[in-house]
């Protein structure tokens, strides 16, 4: 009979050491795993848009210094996201190619589902103040200024082909696998990597795309 009063000695196998380079790669591998999640099942947010005016109207507020995007409505913050900004985040955007994220009051002027960055919500940059400042400094013509003012006041997409630049918006990560992997490895969140846009994880921008309509006010703080 066995003496069960004594612990049975089991053969122990030596643990294999995990190499240091592999340990360093673990955060990046986890990032890639998150980015590869199928976003097609991401549901609409519980705070879905409930009207175009009054207390129910949503507002997007982006704080560049804190790198946070808030969805506000009904007098409170409904959702907060960590964001990535332009490679040159300090200061307001003033010209095409300056890698800066705009600052000021804007609105969602268009939405694009088939974007190379998964989903794209266009922001109405350049806005009125951008156009007026640029005209006073001689950066754009009077016709360009008037065209921007007209479109913005109509609630439409302003010209994106002036010296002030355009195609600034809220989007996800690239749909191209190689580029998405490259950004994930060398610019992990919250490091800034865009040309001036505001970037979220793909499942996050999917939520915004389904719940934030064209016309939603956008405030971008320094």
Give residue spans per PLM region.
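Bacterial N-terminal signal peptides
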Residues: 24-36
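Bacterial Sec-dependent signal peptides at the C-terminal "C-region" and cleavage site
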Residues: 35-44
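N-terminal post-signal-peptidase region of extra-cytosolic proteins
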Residues: 44-59, 64-65, 82-110, 152-155, ...
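Exported/periplasmic cell-wall-interacting domains
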Residues: 49-52, 110, 114-222
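N-terminal secretory signal peptides that target proteins for export/translocation
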Residues: 1-20
């Amino acid at each position: 009979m066995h003496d069960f009063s004594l612990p049975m000695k089991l053969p122990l196998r030596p643990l294999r050491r995990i190499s240091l380079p592999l340990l360093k790669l673990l955060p990046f591998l986890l990032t890639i795993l998150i980015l590869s999640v199928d976003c097609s099942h991401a549901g609409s947010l519980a705070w879905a848009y409930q009207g175009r005016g009054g207390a129910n109207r949503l507002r997007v507020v982006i704080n560049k210094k804190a790198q946070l995007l808030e969805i506000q409505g009904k007098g409170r913050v409904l959702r907060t996201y960590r964001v990535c900004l332009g490679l040159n985040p300090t200061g307001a955007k003033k010209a095409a190619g300056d890698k800066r994220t705009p600052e000021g009051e804007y609105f969602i002027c268009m939405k694009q589902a088939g974007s190379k960055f998964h989903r794209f919500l266009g922001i109405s940059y350049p806005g009125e103040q951008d156009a007026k400042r640029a005209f006073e400094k001689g950066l754009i013509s009077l016709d360009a200024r008037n065209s921007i003012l007209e479109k913005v006041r109509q609630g439409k997409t302003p010209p994106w082909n002036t010296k002030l630049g355009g195609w600034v918006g809220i989007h996800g990560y690239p749909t191209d696998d190689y580029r998405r992997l490259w950004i994930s490895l060398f610019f992990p969140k919250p490091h800034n990597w865009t040309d001036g846009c505001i970037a979220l994880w793909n499942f996050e921008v999917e939520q915004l795309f389904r719940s934030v309509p064209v016309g939603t006010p956008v405030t971008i703080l320094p």
